Amino acid sequence: MGSMSVWHWVIVAVVVMLLFGRGKVSELMGDVAKGIKAFKKGMADDETQPNTATSVPPVGPNDPVRTLPHQGAPGTAPQPPHVQPHVPAGDHKAV
């Protein structure tokens, strides 16, 4: 009683067909199929074309070590360190 039988799914399908019409459902399924085909084609293209722009050349044991300067997040300028101003001991004023 708790599980969905075949008849439940048949009734759901009939209600969907009545609400959306036969043409709309077939159009929607065609769009889904086109999307799946485009996804598979894109995945196949990625597998056949290795990305040579990001490939790193092999490093030998006698090659010099190259380092890159530290970079922050894109679009942010490096911030100078925050320094507290020095106030002499006798010159404290209430703000």
Swiss-Prot record:
* Localisation per UniProt entry: Cell inner membrane
Naming one, the record's GO cellular component terms include:
TAT protein transport complex
Name its GO BP terms in alphabetical order.
protein transport by the Tat complex
Output the Gene3D superfamilies linked to this UniProt entry.
1.20.5.3310
Query: Topology versus the membrane, per the UniProt entry?
Result: Single-pass membrane protein
List the InterPro entries: TatA/B/E, TatA/E
Subunit annotation: The Tat system comprises two distinct complexes: a TatABC complex, containing multiple copies of TatA, TatB and TatC subunits, and a separate TatA complex, containing only TatA subunits. Substrates initially bind to the TatABC complex, which probably triggers association of the separate TatA complex to form the active translocon.
Purpose of the protein: Part of the twin-arginine translocation (Tat) system that transports large folded proteins containing a characteristic twin-arginine motif in their signal peptide across membranes. TatA could form the protein-conducting channel of the Tat system.
Query: Can you say what this protein is called?
Result: Sec-independent protein translocase protein TatA
Source organism? Methylorubrum extorquens (strain PA1)
Query: Its encoding gene is what?
Result: tatA
